[in-house]
Regions:
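Residue-level structural signal for beta-strand termini and adjacent loop
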Residues: 49, 71-72, 144
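Short loop/beta submotifs within extracellular cysteine-rich repeat domains
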Residues: 31, 42, 66, 74-77, ...
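Short, flexible, solvent-exposed loop/turn segments with mixed acidic/basic and small polar residues
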Residues: 10-12, 79-85
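Vicinal oxygen chelate
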Residues: 2-12, 25-33, 57-58, 67, 72-73, 84-159
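Short, structured motif recognition centered on aromatic/hydrophobic residues
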Residues: 18-25, 35, 59, 66-69, ...
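Long, hydrophobic N-terminal alpha-helical segment
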Residues: 2, 6-54
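C-terminal "cap" of GNAT-fold acetyltransferases
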Residues: 49-65
Length: 159
């Protein structure tokens, strides 16, 4: 049976590339040594994300990235995930052309969203879809560089 969102424009119904795969780690320094030294990935950046109480690192691999996520506060969801499941896979992130329109379509389709509107992420506007709607997988969406949410969230113009 067709969804009400089936009439959405093509750019709202299609995902772009895999932006990154995120891994929860105890130590970015230890984990990045493996990914950089053993597998040859290039470390792009390490940064603190105070609002999420994590430290992250991005390592380039082809047109995508591996994101290492280290909790900086033992009371966060990321810290609880690490304590209960250990290091490993956390989420996959897909690029979309218009995040707000995509979230609206997903909501119309009945998916459970963690973020109902774009919010500021490390590399652009982001939102998460709850694992209950994704067969147990946490899915992040990131708006493509220069998309409509960039300016409203205070990101610089992307050229």
């Amino acid at each position: 049976m067709p969804s009400p969102a089936d009439h959405a424009p093509e750019h709202v119904r299609r995902l772009g590339k895999v932006h990154h795969v995120a891994l929860i780690v105890r130590s970015i320094e230890d984990a990045s040594r493996f990914w950089r030294d053993a597998l040859g990935l290039e470390l792009e950046a390490v940064q603190d994300i105070p609002q999420d109480r994590v430290r992250i690192a991005f390592l380039a691999v082809g047109e995508s990235k591996v994101e290492l996520v280290e909790p900086t506060d033992d009371t966060t969801g990321v810290a609880r995930f690490l304590a209960s499941k250990g290091e490993g896979f956390h989420h996959v992130c897909f690029e979309v052309s218009n995040l707000a329109e995509t979230l609206l379509r997903l909501e119309i389709d009945g998916l459970e969203l963690i973020d109902s509107a774009p919010r500021r992420g490390a590399e652009g506007p982001v939102a998460f879809i709850h694992p209950r709607s994704c067969h147990g997988v946490l899915v992040e969406l990131i708006e493509a560089p220069g998309g409509p949410s960039w300016e409203s969230l205070g990101f610089p113009p992307h050229g």
